[in-house]
Amino acid sequence: MLPPFIIDGRNTAEIFLANMDYAQVAGAVVVQELIDGIQNDYLEEVKRKYAERFFVFGMFDFFNGSPVRQVEELYGRGFRGIAIPGHRLILNDRRVYLNSPEMMEMFKLMERKGMILSICLAANHQQMDEIKEVIAECPELKIAIGHFGMVTQPGWEEQIMLARNKNVYVESGGITWLFNSEFYPYPSA
């Protein structure tokens, strides 16, 4: 839900910064979502203009091209984190497995470069074995499990338990999205 003062549907970096200043928030993390489209060009500009205020995650085309090449290119553009909406990698006609050879090579590249992975996982344990393999193979890769483990979906508790591993964290930024019908203070969250 957008605040009423955003009349054109665009929450630009400048509008967001004004709200951050008003709320006395020093910095923010921007994680992309596939439903909004890949926004690397805009976020690269935001990162350049407001590097001290925003940490931005890049995103790539998961269904086309080499994950390694795309992440190398994003790293070259200054992105130090990659967002993967894992729950959107499972389609009726195709699927990208997190532990496929191409994806594992990409995760190892991210680990070597000191990048951060922000990932949302599918419900019902569909990707748990895959992400556990990533965690085991890339123990130095910093991983943020998104949307508090997709707390409104079955199997979220197992996602939270992943934080028992070194360098695996849980972020709660998606609470406002998952509980958007309630509005602040999100009583059932």
Q: Where are the predicted features?
A:
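Mid-domain alpha/beta scaffold segments of enzyme catalytic cores
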Residues: 1-105, 109-113, 153, 162
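Catalytic pocket-lining loop regions of alpha/beta-barrel enzymes
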Residues: 81, 96-189
